[in-house]
């Protein structure tokens, strides 16, 4: 925390893990860094490579009792989510699967129907697993249904005006997901202060686009409070004929999670057969939002 302003800082780093060493781990511990490793599991060599070095980094972190998380990009080649989950839980207790949605430059995008089908299979598999891994987006959706979701990812949190992407060359983008000129706001050296960045024509055109999108979503979708109209990059890409991937997933998967949780909480006298992390989430909901939980089950 800054003693001068009272501002809290949280440090994290995303890496492929290939150069993790004892020296780096000591530094991460001393600086209280959260470390995420980009690793695509069984198919890592297809798009990232150096899997042996990444696994060596995992094993070293495990030996020195330094927990790391993983982020895996889901493409057509690694769409067997249950197999990916089983592979990754050897190395981490906190994993996240991020589907590769269609962009102007991506040839690896998964089909929505296939991804949703795999996500449901993974959900059922995780529910009955004894492993305590925090699995996103599964846990993220469960927390929303239970009424205990407190923080949101940028794609569901109306991020415009709160975040910027600045690459190594100093190029400023509204979002790193889109390389289109409409999202490029110029170079860092062109601005006297950050507020000037948010007052430009390009930025405000994207804001106008999202205001219109959110008005439509709020009037037509019951999940608006969860997604806040979705991701600005996906909304922009959808104007070129691409499907709004996250929107379609939420509309299909969220009702599925609601139905399954209602079944579990209404019929199970005990939750002992379920994932310990799931039980922990239900217990948290009992404390924080018992009325929501009563709606889901006969409590």
Predicted regions and their residues:
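Long, K/E/R/D-enriched contiguous segments that form extended
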Residues: 81-86, 90-152
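C-terminal accessory region of radical SAM enzymes
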Residues: 115-147, 177-222, 228
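Radical SAM/AdoMet-radical enzyme domain recognition
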Residues: 1-108
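Beta-strand scaffold of nucleotide-dependent catalytic cores
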Residues: 172-176
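Short, small/polar residue-rich loop motifs at catalytic or cofactor-binding pockets
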Residues: 156-160
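Radical SAM enzyme core and accessory elements
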Residues: 169-171, 213-299
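Conserved, mostly hydrophobic/aromatic
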Residues: 13, 122, 170
């Amino acid at each position: 925390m800054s003693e001068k302003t009272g501002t809290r800082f949280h440090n994290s780093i995303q890496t492929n893990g290939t150069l993790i060493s004892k020296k780096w781990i000591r530094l991460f511990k001393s600086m209280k860094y959260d470390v995420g490793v980009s690793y695509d599991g069984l198919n890592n060599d297809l798009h990232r490579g150096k899997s042996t070095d990444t696994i060596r980094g995992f094993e070293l972190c495990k030996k020195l009792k330094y927990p790391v998380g993983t982020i895996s990009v889901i493409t057509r080649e690694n769409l067997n989510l249950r197999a990916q989950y089983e592979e990754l839980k050897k190395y981490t207790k906190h994993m996240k699967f991020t589907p590769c949605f269609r962009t102007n430059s991506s040839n690896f995008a998964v089909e929505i129907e296939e991804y949703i089908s795999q996500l449901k299979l993974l959900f059922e598999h995780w529910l009955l697993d004894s492993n305590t891994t925090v699995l996103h987006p599964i846990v993220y959706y469960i927390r929303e249904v239970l009424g205990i979701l407190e923080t949101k990812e940028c794609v569901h949190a109306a991020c415009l005006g709160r975040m910027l992407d600045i690459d190594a060359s100093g190029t400023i983008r509204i979002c790193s997901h889109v390389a289109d000129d409409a999202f490029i706001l110029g170079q860092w050296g062109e601005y006297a202060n950050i507020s000037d960045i948010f007052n430009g024509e390009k930025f405000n055109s994207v804001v106008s686009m999202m205001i219109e999108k959110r008005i439509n979503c709020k009037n037509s979708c019951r999940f608006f409070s969860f997604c806040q109209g979705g991701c600005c990059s996906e909304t922009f890409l959808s104007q070129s004929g691409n499907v709004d991937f996250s929107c379609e997933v939420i509309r299909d998967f969220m009702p599925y999670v609601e139905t399954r949780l209602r079944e579990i909480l209404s019929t199970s006298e005990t939750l002992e057969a379920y994932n310990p992390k799931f039980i922990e989430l239900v217990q948290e909901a009992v404390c924080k939002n018992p009325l929501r939980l009563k709606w889901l089950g006969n409590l």
